[in-house]
Amino acid sequence: MLAWLIAAVALLAGLMATSSSAMATDLPYGPYTCAAGYVWRDAYAGDQVCVTPAIRTQTATEHALGPSRREPNGGIYGPDTCRQGFVWRATRPSDHVCVPPDSRDQASSDNANAVSRLADPGATPRGGVSVTTTSSPTGGRLFATGSGLTPYSTVRFYSAPTTWPVSLGRLTADAAGTLQGWQQVAALHCDSGPYPATIVVLDQGTGLVTTAGTTDAFHPCS
């Protein structure tokens, strides 16, 4: 009996691994494959935030024009000080390309919408955030902790069903880019989502999307 149980568990683990690998293989450009109609922004090497083709073209143009929009002799922000009428684009904290204010607003909006523009946000790799759930007959409470985030950034949490990511809540990273201790993200209700659900994390300071584990809070109501 014990040998049969061990064999069954091994078979199940193998099937799960095969399923996971197949899911990754199904995405033509890896875990950050964009949904139809979107492409990578490419504001810097490794920038895989999904945007419209027009915004990627605009981003490339901003790179070309960036040097001409800096104060030639520097200023209060050093050599990256922008001329009057321009601001840093800030697709991430170190992005000091000088652009019109509308372009910075666009970059912030694109970061905030990064999850919904991925083909499968639940296929993204594990990041520095972990989650845990305290369960109850009516659902449960989702808590998160972690590091490696943008300092002072808004950190958003989603559940990843097969159709559309559902927003669960948000936290704010501290000055070191961490979520100290176990902080409550949301109170979740049974029968209100996929079960179990993959939790997706968005670092809004960079638009980076990762996963943080799963929750059983959406279990069938008792």
Which sequence ranges carry the predicted segments?
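Cleaved targeting-peptide boundary
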Residues: 25-31
